Design a protein with these regions (language model features):
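Positively charged, low-complexity/disordered segments
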Residues: 182-193
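Hydrophobic alpha-helical transmembrane bundles of multi-pass membrane proteins
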Residues: 1-183
Length: 193
């Protein structure tokens, strides 16, 4: 085995392990949310988190990954929507040339679990306050917002061009949430100002 193949395997293994660890955060946030609500809603919360992660995964596969990491401009990616298995197995090739040290599938897995966990952070504030369809709509919209923000920082966007580095994702995850909450607050408060 060549050293480059060994390095690729090690990088891929590490990214997949990290993605699995981030996925476990979903369970942690579900437990936190269940602990903050009445006991009769605990099963509803667990099921909701699984369903919304599914919605997030589908939206991120169909549109979000292309917006975040597809070739495009400094605001959003304009290619690579609904990636095929073959395109995700390539390393460092268009439209996902951002992933130069791991296959696109490993990068996709890592990014989709981050999009899902950023949604789970928000759900704690919405527990017992919304109907199930609201979670679906909010989850799809938030996944798109997360995709745009991740393109700005990680996908070669305008913040990346300014030299911004975000290794752990705190800027992308938190700023996506803040933009969404800001839009909601502005729409509710604007008639009163």
């Amino acid at each position: 085995m060549k050293s480059s193949d060994l390095l690729l395997a090690a990088n891929t293994l590490w990214v997949v392990v990290a993605a699995v660890l981030v996925m476990f955060m979903q369970a942690g946030f579900a437990f936190l949310e269940a602990g903050l609500t009445r006991m009769k809603n605990a099963a509803h919360i667990a099921g909701k988190n699984v369903l919304i992660f599914g919605v997030c995964s589908l939206v991120y596969w169909a549109v979000g990954f292309g917006i975040a990491f597809g070739d495009g401009n400094s605001v959003l990616g304009t290619s690579g929507f609904a990636p095929s298995v073959d395109s995700l197995l390539a390393v460092g090739q268009a439209p996902y040339s951002f992933f130069t040290t791991v296959p696109g599938a490993a990068g996709y897995l890592f990014e989709v679990v981050f999009a899902g966990v950023s949604l789970a952070i928000v759900w704690g504030a919405m527990a017992e306050r919304a109907k199930l369809w609201v979670y679906f709509v909010f989850g799809a919209a938030f996944t798109l917002i997360y995709s745009v923000t991740s393109h700005w920082v990680w996908g070669g966007g305008w913040l990346f061009g300014l030299g911004m580095q975000d290794f752990a994702g705190s800027t992308v995850v938190r700023r996506s949430e803040e933009r969404r909450v800001g839009k909601e607050c502005r729409s509710r408060w604007s008639p009163y100002h």
